[in-house]
């Protein structure tokens, strides 16, 4: 499974804002799972540094961004992605870039705290809790499925 993690999921955890425990569970699960390929936009890293550096020193902000970089793959910022984001109907250019990035690599799900910002998405958009519930159902179904017979 290939997922795209929106910047606000990382910000949830960094700032421990409302809903952060679900976001933390997503990040922990994708870090431990060999079945989940996690991606984010190249735009996410400077945004995370900016938000983090507002509350901690430069070294800590850079260390935190580097830790995230080691756990996710980055969708490169290309002219095609920027063109798609500019042409998109959504009012938030940053969200348009995130969506264009996710769609460019054909992810199964985009995980975000703000689903309403991705109403025009052609891919599945879930909040962290919805994605976690989906994973729990899949795990239960896997346990209930009998092994193939002889």
Predicted regions and their residues:
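Short, well-structured N-terminal submotif of metal-dependent ribonuclease cores
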Residues: 1-39, 55-60, 136-150
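Acidic, PIN/NYN-like endoribonuclease modules and their adjacent C-terminal/linker elements
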Residues: 2, 71, 104-150
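Acidic active-site catalytic centers that drive phospho-/nucleotidyl reactions
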Residues: 6, 95, 114
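A generic structural signal for short hydrophobic patches within well-formed alpha-helices
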Residues: 10, 45, 82, 118, ...
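Amphipathic coiled-coil/heptad-repeat helices and related helical stalk/stem segments
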Residues: 23, 94-95
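Acidic catalytic patch
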Residues: 42-44, 64-89
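Short active-site alpha-helical segment characteristic of glycosyltransferases
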Residues: 98
């Amino acid at each position: 499974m290939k997922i795209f993690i929106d910047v606000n999921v990382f910000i949830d955890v960094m700032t421990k804002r409302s809903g952060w425990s679900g976001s933390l569970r997503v990040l922990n699960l994708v870090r431990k799972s060999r079945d989940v390929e996690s991606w984010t936009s190249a735009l996410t890293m400077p945004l995370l540094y900016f938000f983090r550096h507002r509350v901690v020193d430069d070294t800590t902000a850079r260390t935190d961004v580097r830790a995230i970089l080691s756990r996710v793959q980055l969708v490169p910022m290309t002219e095609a992605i920027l063109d798609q984001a500019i042409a998109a109907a959504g009012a938030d250019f940053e969200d348009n870039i995130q969506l264009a990035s996710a769609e460019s690599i054909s992810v199964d799900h985009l995980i975000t705290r703000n689903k309403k910002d991705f109403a025009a998405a052609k891919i599945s958009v879930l909040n962290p809790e919805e994605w976690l519930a989906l994973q729990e159902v899949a795990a239960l179904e896997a346990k209930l499925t009998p092994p193939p017979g002889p």
